Amino acid sequence: RDARAVATRGARDDARRRAKRLSNAATIGATNAKMSGDDAKRASDAASARDKLLWIIIYSLCSSTMLVINKLAVGANGLPTVVAGAQLAVSAAVVVVMEFAGAGVLGPFEKKRIVPFVLYTTMFAMGLFSNMKALMLTNVGAVISARCCLPLIVCSIEWFFMNRAFPNARSVMSLMGVVVSAGIYIANDTGVDIQGGAGMFWLLVWWLLLAVQMTYGKHLTENIAMTQWERVFYTNAMAIPPTIVLYYATGENELEMEDGEGAMFYLILSCVVGVAISYSGWKCRSVITATTFTLVGVLNKMATITFTIIVWPKDFSVVKTLALIASVGFGLLYTEAPLRKPKVAGAGTSPLGIKH
């Protein structure tokens, strides 16, 4: 009996030791799996951050270049609507050529894909018209001021309607810093000049249309599955009719195209950059939030003005230059707000109760 008891205890001890070894092995395996999962997530986040930075840089270079080339092209040709129309037509034509060449960049023409882009280009045309009216009744300083405040309203729209968390303190400071720095620049440059209620009305209409356009563009990239080249085609092709209307409405049809130095070269170059900015713009918009995309546009404008002042110091001012540099610096502090984590009760709804 003693021998059997000893053997039984030994067997139990062996079983406990084996169970402990198996438990330790399982714990180590789970820990390793968690570490591997964490490493994979960190690698994925790093790759995503690099992708975002790459397309922000590409889009910014195209945007800044486009501002300069457009000025040269319009200056040489004298017809801004013709320059814009040529850029739209070439961008749409490039996608069609790619499709006929077998690139497979265009999907089926369906109502559920076409109608949203009709709405988007309608907002674009209305925004362009209201911007022209705003510039007629206000000055450049007022328009730049409104544009610099735009990320704040876009940020609010994303929070209310697009399930984004509210930006952290650093990002709020960043957005406010851009506004204050731009205000200092404008106060020392042209100031803000608004001609009565009509000027304020058109400035507000343009501002709100642009804010909705920015957020709706992000909505398109998230909810309508298509290639970036399809987005390039739809936005450019559908913007041609409103541009033709503007061509006649502004009286450009009664003018002759000027034959300034390098007119054709600058026109062709603007069309090439137009294709690049169309693609990089949609690609950039698809990888970052609407607020970040709006802020990038503001910083591109401020950086271009800074470059112009430094290279062509006709109206150089230390205060203006430092204010511009500060606005860009504040903008670089911005970090994207993540999506809100759904709550157990009422998960997947915005603060206004709109389901996502």
Residue ranges of predicted features:
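Polytopic endomembrane small-metabolite transporters, centered on the Drug/Metabolite Transporter
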Residues: 1-4, 9-356
